[in-house]
Structure formats: C-alpha cells, structure tokens
Amino acid sequence: LQGLYIKVEDGSCEVIGSDLDLVIKAKLNVDSMVGGECLVNARILSEVVRKMSSGEIVFSDLGNEVMIEADKSEYKLRKLDHLTYPKALLENSFEQENSQKLAPFELFTALRKVGIAASPEGGKPILTGVFFDNDGEKTTLVSTDSYRLATNTISNLPIDDAGIVSYRSLNETIKLFEDSEQDIFINSTERELHFYNEKYYTSVRKLEGNYPEYQALFPKENVFSIEVDKKKILESLDRSTVVAEGFIPVTLKVVDENNLNISSTNKDIGGGVE
C-alpha cells in the first residue's frame, strides 16, 4: 500500500492509491503506445512529478524500472510487485445502479464546519468520524472529541445510511471534488461510502460502533445567552489564547450586558486577558 498502482489501457490511464480506510482513483486521457500496469513508490513518485517543470511527462516501462522524463529531467524508479496489490482495491465494490446524484456544495460546506470538532487520528476511533444522523428529509452532521461538539443540519441528502465516517477521509474527498461545479454521484454500501464522477473516485470506510448520544449533551436551558460579532470574537480569542497550549482552558465571563471577559492562564508561561 506504499505504492501507486498505475494502469494504462486504450489511451486511458488510471492511478489508484489506498491506505485501506480510503481509496482514491483518478482517470486521465494519455497518448499510450503500449498498455500495461505497474506499482511505484507513492511518496517518491509524487515528489518527482511535483518537482518537474510544467509540460509533457513521458513514462516508460523498462522491465524492473519506470523511467520518467520531462524537459531536461530524467528519473528511473524501481517498480514494486504489482501482483501483490489487493485485488479488491482494483474493482468497484458497489452496484452503480444504486448510486444517487449529489450537488456537493451544501454537504462539503457542512462537513468542513463540523469536522473541526472531530478527534484527530490516534484518538478514540469512533470520535475521529462524522456521524450522519438522518431524520426524514433532514440529516444532522455531528462530530465531537469529547471536549467540544459541532452539529450542522442539511436537507435532501439522497442516502439515509451513511453512518459514521472518518473525517480525515471525508476531507480528502472534499479536496478531490471541491473544484467541480457539476453534480457527483454518491453510493452507500454496508461498509463504505463512495463518491465519484467521470474523473475521480473515492471509497471511504465506515467506522463501526455506536456514536455517543450527542443530543443529551445539549443543555435543557441556558444559563445565559450572548450575541457577538463573529469577526470580533474570533480575533479576541486569538489574542487572549496566545499563551494557551494543548488543552489549557479558556474562561469566558459576562461582565455586564455590554462586555465579555476572555482569559487564559498557563502556569508555565503566563496569561492573557481580552
């Protein structure tokens, strides 16, 4: 899985990469003199292509190596054994007729809003994901790392069994499709969520387990409620938490109906007040 699987056939090139939690496929048209397939170290190949000057790049199969040429640059990379690549990753594991069209803007915007509260990789697995809580025509997206909670409700999501999906994988999917102004297709199976169009495809593994009862975390009544200017509160938080590191708590104190005091204290460094 450290390699990129490259397959060339009839003027089309397909590139596949995966870490098992996420599968990404990209298709592009090429001028091919001969078809074939190979597996090349993903990190090195990506770095080589990124550093090459813009323009035409030529790939040649030399048996145990792949030669890459562009302008005055030439690289020869040793191939990995493509026969060891998992066959399941080379084929689509869903029935295309069950796919639904999706205008991605609303979904992707909502995912980015709630994703900031998801636990980072390495934390409790279920909390690294976004929970799709369906209720009729509305779907509430939920994420929490147990310190904070974010929700956002969208309408008309064409599937109702998305479950819990890793935010890291969803964020990579957003990056892939965010520049497209056209609808994409979405397909949900028992274990995976699939997104695709004519050029790109991603398969995101669903997380197993039960998501926390997030609705119980909302208070039945508010001790106080304040309305603030978004830009001002973000700038104030940024200034007052310069000395905060990790999970140093931030204290919010309502001084009166017109003033809010924001402070943080780090016993090793100092403190800040806004």
Predicted feature descriptions by range:
Residues L1-E274:
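Structural preference for solvent-exposed beta-strand-turn elements
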